[in-house]
A protein has these predicted regions:
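Surface-exposed loops/turns
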Residues: 1-3, 13, 38-39, 52, ...
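Aromatic/hydrophobic beta-strand junction motif of beta-rich domains
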Residues: 5-13, 46
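Solvent-exposed serine/threonine-rich low-complexity stretches and specific carbohydrate-binding patches
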Residues: 29-38
Length: 86
């Protein structure tokens, strides 16, 4: 990746948001957050590195974004594939 991967989304309420990156076999390689974010247009950036700061190899990974509302009850999940190409 020459640039950070940027995930863009809209929150209808204030929420605690976490981004996780997994291998296709389900191994967690990176977790960002949780971090509090206000309602509205939001972005999270990921630099292509694992938890130890190493650049991930080219390939396909899975991302998951979880947003938990201030009440601790409401939860929204987004997930999908992510390709790393350098």
């Amino acid at each position: 990746m020459r640039q950070d991967a940027v995930f863009t989304y809209v929150l209808s309420h204030d929420a605690s948001v976490e981004l996780a990156i997994y291998t296709l076999s389900g191994r967690l390689v990176c977790r960002l957050g949780p971090q509090g974010q206000p309602a509205g247009f939001q972005q999270l950036s990921w630099d292509g590195r694992d938890q130890s700061g190493r650049l991930l190899a080219n390939g396909t990974y899975l991302y998951r974004i979880v947003a938990v509302g201030g009440d601790g009850e409401s939860e929204v999940r987004f997930r999908g594939p992510l390709s790393v190409l350098r």
